[in-house]
């Protein structure tokens, strides 16, 4: 059966574009030993439309789909409900990596692209640990994230945090404290939540 597609709709192009943005974030999270690739299946001879940390495999944008990946694509297209696969492999330099291939679906739920992740298993432990350990003083070190069960709890927590920030700042006059609290909540996007004005 011929499962090939020849052209993407504008909506499907936007879908692929959104995955390209996700590729950057995922690669940054896992570090330089994680390769992330987006394939456009309308052009198998130049299917790689996005690649982050391509130095790991030596590939770049415009590279063709690999034989192994193409084989998995055919299996996914022929098997209902199969939309991802994870496996272990080696590159041409003999370096082992764990790979994941996930289908990117189009408007008619057909596979239009692939979201692929390759994590190299020869990554030194120190390098791996440094990826998840702040080395320099950054803004992210000071972020405290609280997970909540509902948006009301989220809003109330945000309100308490804003109050603490404002009340501890002695340069803010008493008459401006409420204004500053509202300003902080606005900057955090709290007022985009339903019923935020009533709750706050």
Outline where the language-model segments fall.
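Phosphate-/nucleic-acid-contacting segments
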Residues: 176-200
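Structured interaction and signal-relay segments at domain junctions
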Residues: 23-85, 90-92
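Short leucine-rich amphipathic alpha-helical surface patches
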Residues: 34, 162-166, 170, 185-193
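Juxtadomain coupling helices with adjacent low-complexity linkers
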Residues: 2-16, 29, 113-114, 119-176
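Short loop/turn and capping residues at structural boundaries
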Residues: 38, 101, 196-197
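Glycine-centered flexibility motif
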Residues: 62, 117, 189-190
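Sensory/regulatory domains in signal-transduction proteins
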Residues: 68, 72-134
